[in-house]
């Protein structure tokens, strides 16, 4: 997997202060995408052992609420194994941190992926460029664990 950046102290991509991993690779190519530079899965940097440790160190800071996977699309097929490995590690070894994931796939397309059990919040659906201020009107913020338990989409806060 390749990535473009690991940012810390982000307040726009989930609850609290977060570390965000911006991955390379996206096959949705949304009109008006804010990150078209991330579409090519071979651009950016190779996500190696050093990058993995950097991510864990940043997430492990006491004031960080958790990690957000964005991009590109973290669920681009070539990214899935690595993303789910990272999510599993964080949930198991860095307690108290939440895992958010932004994707262009619909929940209904990806809910059965084995690694979804490591994701707390999923923001699904393609970007809608007609909604400029707070994201996209068509995106859902899904509580993954509650949705997996009930078999129906449960939005965060319900």
Regions found by a protein language model. Name each.
Residues 38, 72, 126-127:
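Flexible loop residues that form catalytic
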Residues 18, 29, 75-76, 108, ...:
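Short, electropositive, low-hydrophobicity segments enriched in small/polar residues
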Residues 23, 71, 101-103:
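A cross-domain feature marking catalytic cores of carbohydrate-active enzymes
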Residues 40-54, 76-116:
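Canonical radical SAM enzyme core domain
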Residues 54-75:
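Short Fe-S-cluster ligation motifs
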Residues 2, 6-15, 60-62, 92-158:
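Auxiliary Fe-S-binding modules of radical SAM enzymes
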Residues 14-49:
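Canonical Radical SAM [4Fe-4S] cluster-binding loop centered on the CxxxCxxC motif
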